[in-house]
């Protein structure tokens, strides 16, 4: 075992070093090499490391960054898979890079983002102290299948680690059912008030009771199927969260201000990101940090100080034009981005980049469920719409049927002229790419304009 660990770690480090010299990310392939040499190496490398693991459909990267900030503020010796390589190969690579050749950890702590489908495999080997389950939404139907399949993957993974503290979203009727299937200690988090309107017309990925299939009723909805749900037939309902947002003072263009209950006391919390869905990321991170032993004061400071993950409300200077990039990958997340954009009340240029590679989901039918009509409703504030990516023509057609003025839509089949157009914009630029489009465009932006690589 020791010999296999040695060679697994050695080859992983060599592969990572070579790929970085070639200016490649090297975030997952080195882990695949290590797992080929020793399939159980992750379990060996993670011994003695105190881990917070974040999984779920939306919010993994941003929540992980919020948690990281608290670790950094406390001066803890930690690492994280901040590149977004969240399958078992990427996670294994990160542990190997922070281990000695004999497999001894160099860091005592880790913040790990884990793909929801991969959690059933990762958690066979990794035993986190805290697991955060953010939410479950319809996402990449070609890969994940039905929404309950995603939920079952998470449950199956958690069954391998019964001592981990579960921090679950009380407002997600799917995630809230997890304690029925596992014996783990549970901390619930949620939002006790509507967020920027109670839009009951918004599409719901889980409108019916997970137990008896009766349609839920809501005391209020926050977004998607999240909110104060209850089943009028069998009685399944949202349970009161221990960590909760109890009031919203401000949903600004760049930040938010809320009142949050942590440990039975209320705190004024400034969140260093805008949009309703980031309030969920903040309260989920607060629950995880509280369960891990951080004080409320440390949590509040971290939520106001953290920097966003790449492509998640990330700001760019486009040669003097302000730009912001917001990853979109499914109807629920896209709708929240649209809600944020529709509330800006300023002239802007919008960019939508649609790819259909494996990491994006090859089935792009989700764009017809996303509420792009909100863009059309912006009227004269919608100055330009630039469309790009492998499926740019499909996106142009979707925007046409959403009611966007065709005269305002311009298609770019290459990123270099798109970047030139963004930099020449007289208005702030808001970029909405799918995952691989984000990596492609961000890489091209980095080469032209400078900035950090995506793994930094």
PLM regions and their residue ranges:
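Adenine nucleotide phosphate-binding catalytic loops in nucleotide-utilizing enzymes
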Residues: 187-331
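Short glycine-/acidic-enriched loop or helix-start segments at secondary-structure transitions
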Residues: 63-64, 121-122, 142-143, 176-179, ...
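Phosphate-binding loop of NTP-binding sites
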Residues: 3-190, 196-208
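Conserved beta-strand termini and adjacent loop/short-helix elements that scaffold enzyme active sites
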Residues: 81, 169-170, 189-191, 316, ...
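Residue-level signal for inorganic ion chemistry
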Residues: 113, 134, 167, 281, ...
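Buried hydrophobic packing segments
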Residues: 67, 71, 91-95, 282-292, ...
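Conserved active-site and cofactor/substrate-binding residues in soluble primary-metabolism enzymes
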Residues: 28, 49, 62, 86, ...
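ATP-dependent carboxylate-amine ligase
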Residues: 2-20, 25-27, 213, 226-228, ...
């Amino acid at each position: 075992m020791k010999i296999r660990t040695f060679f697994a770690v050695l080859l992983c480090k060599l592969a990572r070093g070579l790929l970085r010299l070639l200016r490649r990310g090297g975030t997952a392939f080195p882990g695949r090499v290590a797992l080929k040499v020793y399939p159980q190496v992750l379990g060996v490398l993670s011994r003695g490391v105190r881990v917070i693991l974040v999984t779920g459909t939306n919010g993994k990267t941003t929540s992980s960054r919020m948690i990281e900030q608290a670790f950094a503020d406390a001066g803890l010796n930690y690492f994280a898979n901040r590149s977004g390589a969240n399958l078992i190969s990427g996670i294994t690579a990160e542990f190997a890079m922070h281990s000695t050749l004999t497999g001894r950890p160099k860091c005592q702590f880790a913040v790990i983002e884990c793909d929801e489908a991969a959690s059933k495999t990762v958690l066979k080997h990794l035993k986190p102290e805290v697991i955060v389950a953010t939410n479950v939404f319809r996402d990449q139907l070609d890969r994940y299948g039905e929404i309950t399949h995603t939920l079952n993957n998470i449950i199956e993974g958690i069954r391998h680690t019964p001592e981990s503290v579960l921090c679950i979203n009380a407002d997600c009727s799917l995630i809230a059912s997890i304690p029925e299937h596992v014996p783990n200690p549970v901390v619930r988090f949620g939002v006790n008030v509507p967020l920027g309107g109670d839009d009951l017309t918004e599409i719901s990925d889980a409108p019916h009771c997970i137990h008896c299939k009766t349609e839920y009723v809501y005391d209020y909805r926050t977004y998607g199927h999240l909110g104060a749900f209850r089943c009028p037939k069998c009685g399944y309902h949202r349970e009161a969260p221990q960590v909760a947002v109890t009031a919203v003072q401000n949903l600004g263009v760049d930040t938010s201000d809320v009142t949050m209950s942590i440990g039975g006391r209320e705190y004024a919390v400034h969140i260093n990101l805008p949009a309703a869905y980031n309030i969920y990321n903040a309260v989920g991170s607060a629950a995880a940090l509280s369960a891990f032993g951080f004080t409320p004061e440390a949590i509040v400071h971290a939520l106001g100080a953290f920097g966003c993950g790449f492509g998640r409300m990330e700001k760019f200077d486009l040669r003097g034009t302000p730009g912001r990039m917001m990853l979109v990958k499914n109807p629920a997340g896209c709708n929240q981005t649209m809600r944020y954009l529709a509330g800006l009340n300023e002239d802007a240029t919008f960019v939508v980049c649609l790819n259909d590679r494996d990491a994006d989901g090859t089935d792009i039918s989700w764009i017809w469920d996303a509420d792009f009509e909100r863009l059309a409703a912006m009227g004269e504030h919608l100055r330009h719409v630039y469309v790009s990516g492998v499926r740019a023509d499909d996106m142009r057609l979707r925007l046409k049927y959403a009611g966007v003025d065709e005269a305002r839509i311009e298609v770019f089949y290459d990123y270099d002229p798109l970047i030139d157009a963004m930099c020449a914009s007289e208005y702030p630029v808001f970029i909405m790419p799918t995952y691989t489009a984000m990596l492609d465009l961000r890489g091209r932006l980095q080469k032209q304009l400078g900035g950090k690589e995506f793994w930094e």
